[in-house]
C-alpha cells in the first residue's frame, strides 16, 4: 500500500469503513445467512436477497431515506467495491429495493431474525460469560420509543395515535430491550414494532422472553412466591365454597318451605269441601289466607337467594380457574428451574414507570427478576409523603436531590413487599417528588446514592434510542409494508450492535492507528457518518484484503488489513485477524 499523496492512485471506493463492515459481517457468516432467506420474488438482474443485503449496507452507511442509495451525496449503488465486500456482484436501484421490501412476508422476517440471532449469539454469549465470570449482575434495560408519521397519512399500515415525544402523534411504538454490561455500554437484544397506541406495560413480557432467548440465561424462578399466592387463593376459594354451601342450603330451605306451604294450602282447601263446623271453617280460611299472603314474599326470597347463590357460584368458578392457573404457573416455573441448574444470582430489570403495574411487578418477581423502576403514578408518591415528618432523614444523593426509603411496602396489585424510596428535587423554592421501587432477595440493598445513580444509568438505553435516530435514522420509515418496517427495525438493531462489536477487530486490523481513527472508533456516529463515507483504496490479494484511506479523507494514510475473521470462534478468541505474510 502507498501513503504518500503524490503516489496515491485514484480511490476505488467512497465508503472505506463500509467495506470493513461488510468484510466483518461476511466473514462471520451473516451475509451467507441473509442470502438464504426466503423472499417470494423472482431474480432478474439482482436476487431479492441481494437487495436485503443492500438495505442493511445502506443503513450502516447512514442513509436517511431509501432513495439515498441512488441519489445521496455518495451513492452506494455506484460503488462496486462495497458490493463485492458485502459478497454481491452489485447493488440494485433503490426502487427495486423498495419493491422487494413490499414483497417480503412474515416468513422472510422470521428468517432474517434467525440469521441475525445466529450472527449475534457468540457476541452476546461472550458478554454474558464475562459478566457471570466476574460475578457481576445482568442488567436489562427496557424502553418504548415512538416512531411518528404524518398525522394525515393513510398509507402506513397499522398506525394509531399515541403518546410520542410528549404529545399525541400518529405512528408506531418501538419496544426494545438491551443488556447493559457497563455504564454507557449496551448490547441490543430485541425490538418489536407496535401501533402507536401501545403502552409500555403490554410489551414487558415479550421483551423479557426475547432477552432470555438471546442471552440463553434466566434467573431462578421464585416458585415460593407463587406458592404464597396459591395458598392465599386456596383460602379465598375455601371461603367462597363455604358461602356457596350456606346460600345453597338457604335456597333449599326456602324451596322446602314453599313446597310445604303449597301442600298445606292444597290439603286445607280439600278439607273445606267437606262437612266441618263453621268455627273450624273460619279458622281454616284464615290459615289459607295467611299462607297465600306469604307465598309471594317467599317467591321473592327464593329469587333473591337464587341470584345471590349464582353470583357466588360464578365467583367460585373464577376463583377456582385462577387457582388452577396459578398451579399451572407454579408447575411451569418449577420445570424452568429443573432445567436451569446454575442460574445467575442477580438479574435486574431496569425500566421507567410506564412498564410498571402491580400485575407486571408480580410477574417479574415470580420470574426471578429484581425490578428497579419508578412508581406507576403519583398516588404512591402522595401516600409516601404522608409518612414524612420533621424526623425524616433525607440522604443527599446528587447536587440537587435527596432520598429517603422504606422497606416492606406493598404496592397496589402486588402481594409481595417492596423497598421504595422517595426522591425530592429542589426546583426554585419548592420541591418536586418521585418514587423509586426496588427488590432484592437477600434483603441487602445498595446505599441510596448508589441506587439513585444506578437507576439513572438507564439513560444508556435512552442514549441508544437517540443513536438509533441520529445515526441510523430509524424514525424515517423506509418502507410502508409491515414486513419492510419490521426489517428496518431488525437491521437497525443489528447495525448498532455490529458497529460497536467490530471495534476490537478494527483496532487489531489497524497497525498504526491515528488519533482521529481512535476517536472515530469510540464514536459509532463517526464510524457510520464519517468513516463509512470516506474515500479509500481497497486492494485484494490471495492473502486477504487491505484498505487505505485517501490522503484527503478524514483518516489520511490509515491502513486496515482486513484479514479473515473466522465465522465461528471460541468466546475468548474473538477479533483475531490473520497476519499478512511478509515478502
Give a label for each model feature.
Residues 1-12, 32-583:
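Anion-binding and metal-coordination hotspots
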Residues 11-34:
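Conserved oxyanion/phosphate-binding beta-strand-loop segments in alpha/beta enzyme cores
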Amino acid at each position: 500500500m502507498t501513503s504518500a499523496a503524490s503516489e496515491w492512485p485514484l480511490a476505488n471506493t467512497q465508503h472505506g469503513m463500509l467495506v470493513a463492515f461488510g468484510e466483518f459481517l461476511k466473514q462471520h457468516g451473516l451475509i451467507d445467512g441473509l442470502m438464504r432467506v426466503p423472499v417470494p420474488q423472482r431474480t432478474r438482474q439482482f436476487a431479492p436477497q441481494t437487495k436485503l443485503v443492500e438495505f442493511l449496507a445502506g443503513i450502516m452507511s447512514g442513509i436517511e431515506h431509501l432513495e439515498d442509495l441512488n441519489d445521496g451525496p455518495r451513492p452506494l449503488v455506484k460503488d462496486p467495491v462495497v458490493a463485492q465486500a458485502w459478497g454481491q456482484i452489485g447493488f440494485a436501484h433503490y426502487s427495486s429495493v423498495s419493491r422487494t421490501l413490499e414483497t417480503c412476508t412474515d416468513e422472510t422476517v422470521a428468517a432474517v431474525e434467525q440469521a441475525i440471532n445466529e450472527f449475534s449469539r457468540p457476541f452476546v454469549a461472550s458478554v454474558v460469560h464475562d459478566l457471570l465470570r466476574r460475578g457481576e449482575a445482568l442488567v436489562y434495560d427496557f424502553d418504548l420509543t415512538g416512531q411518528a408519521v404524518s398525522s394525515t397519512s393513510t398509507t402506513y399500515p397499522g398506525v394509531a395515535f399515541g403518546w410520542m415525544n410528549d404529545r399525541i402523534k400518529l405512528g408506531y411504538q418501538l419496544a426494545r430491550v438491551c443488556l447493559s454490561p457497563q455504564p454507557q455500554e449496551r448490547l441490543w437484544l430485541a425490538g418489536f414494532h407496535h401501533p402507536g397506541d401501545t403502552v409500555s406495560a403490554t410489551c414487558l413480557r415479550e421483551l423479557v422472553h426475547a432477552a432470555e432467548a438471546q442471552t440463553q440465561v434466566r434467573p431462578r424462578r421464585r416458585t415460593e412466591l407463587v406458592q404464597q399466592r396459591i395458598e392465599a387463593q386456596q383460602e379465598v376459594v375455601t371461603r367462597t365454597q363455604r358461602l356457596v354451601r350456606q346460600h345453597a342450603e338457604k335456597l333449599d330451605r326456602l324451596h322446602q318451605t314453599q313446597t310445604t306451604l303449597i301442600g298445606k294450602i292444597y290439603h286445607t282447601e280439600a278439607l273445606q269441601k267437606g262437612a266441618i263446623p263453621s268455627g273450624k271453617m273460619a279458622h281454616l280460611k284464615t290459615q289459607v289466607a295467611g299462607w297465600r299472603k306469604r307465598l309471594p314474599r317467599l317467591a321473592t326470597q327464593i329469587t333473591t337467594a337464587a341470584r345471590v347463590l349464582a353470583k357466588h357460584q360464578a365467583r367460585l368458578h373464577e376463583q377456582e380457574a385462577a387457582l388452577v392457573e396459578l398451579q399451572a404457573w407454579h408447575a411451569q416455573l418449577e420445570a424452568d428451574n429443573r432445567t436451569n441448574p446454575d442460574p445467575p444470582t442477580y438479574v435486574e430489570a431496569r425500566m421507567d414507570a410506564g412498564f410498571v403495574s402491580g400485575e407486571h411487578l408480580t410477574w417479574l418477581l415470580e420470574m426471578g427478576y429484581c425490578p428497579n423502576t419508578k412508581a406507576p403514578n403519583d398516588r404512591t408518591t402522595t401516600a409516601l409523603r404522608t409518612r414524612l415528618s420533621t424526623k425524616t432523614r433525607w440522604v443527599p444523593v446528587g447536587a440537587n436531590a435527596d432520598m429517603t426509603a422504606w422497606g416492606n411496602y406493598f404496592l397496589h396489585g402486588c402481594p409481595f413487599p417492596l423497598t421504595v424510596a422517595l426522591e425530592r428535587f429542589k426546583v426554585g423554592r419548592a420541591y418536586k417528588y418521585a418514587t423509586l421501587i426496588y427488590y432484592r432477595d437477600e434483603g441487602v440493598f445498595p446505599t441510596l446514592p448508589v441506587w439513585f445513580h444506578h437507576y439513572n444509568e438507564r439513560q444508556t438505553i435512552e442514549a441508544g434510542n437517540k443513536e438509533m435516530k441520529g445515526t441510523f435514522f430509524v424514525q424515517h420509515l423506509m418502507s410502508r409494508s409491515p414486513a419492510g418496517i419490521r426489517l428496518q427495525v431488525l437491521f437497525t438493531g443489528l447495525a448498532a450492535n455490529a458497529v460497536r462489536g467490530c471495534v476490537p477487530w478494527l483496532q487489531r486490523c489497524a497497525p498504526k492507528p491515528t488519533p482521529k481513527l481512535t476517536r472515530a472508533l469510540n464514536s459509532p456516529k463517526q464510524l457510520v457518518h464519517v468513516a463509512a463515507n470516506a474515500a479509500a483504496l481497497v486492494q485484494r490479494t490471495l492473502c486477504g484484503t487491505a484498505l487505505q484511506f485517501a490522503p484527503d479523507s478524514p483518516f489520511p494514510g490509515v491502513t486496515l488489513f482486513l484479514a479473515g475473521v473466522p465465522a465461528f470462534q471460541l468466546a475468548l478468541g474473538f477479533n483475531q485477524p490473520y497476519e499478512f505474510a511478509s515478502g
